[in-house]
Regions:
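Class I Rossmann-like S-adenosyl-L-methionine
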Residues: 1-129
Length: 129
């Protein structure tokens, strides 16, 4: 799977989780329904999901502050910005990837490193240690 397809899978898993479904069931069903995904793909997707869930409260407060919806895409976007991932490789708009960046996402991704630290605050300390 390409990185954008892995990201799109993580987005759909997070959306189901935010709808109140059990995470273990979601992951199990996703694995059964996507047999083409290799073990490294499944591991990458799980890592994205669990990394985001560890800091969900902080990411949620950033989204609320910016008056943005709280959904899988928004959480994955913040994760990608926080880890300085190449957003154009992730939000490709191609067949299996998430749609291209919105205007808000493009503007938000331009913030400086200092602003990222200010926005994310405590999460930086959490992830460093």
């Amino acid at each position: 799977m390409r990185k954008d397809a892995q990201t799109n899978a993580a987005i759909s898993i997070l959306d189901e989780f935010l709808d109140g479904k059990n995470l273990n069931s979601i992951l199990s069903n996703w694995t059964k329904n996507n047999r083409y995904a290799g073990s490294s793909d499944r591991e990458s997707i799980r890592n994205i999901v669990f990394d985001i869930l560890r800091v969900k409260k902080t990411f949620t407060s950033v989204l609320e502050k910016e008056k943005q919806p709280i959904n899988g895409r928004a959480l994955v976007f913040l994760y990608s910005v926080f880890y300085a991932l190449n957003l154009n490789d992730i939000f490709t708009g191609q067949e299996y990837g998430p749609e291209k960046l919105t205007i808000f996402e493009k503007e938000f991704s331009k913030i400086s490193k200092e602003n990222i630290k200010e926005c994310f605050g405590v999460v930086i300390i959490f992830l460093i240690f």
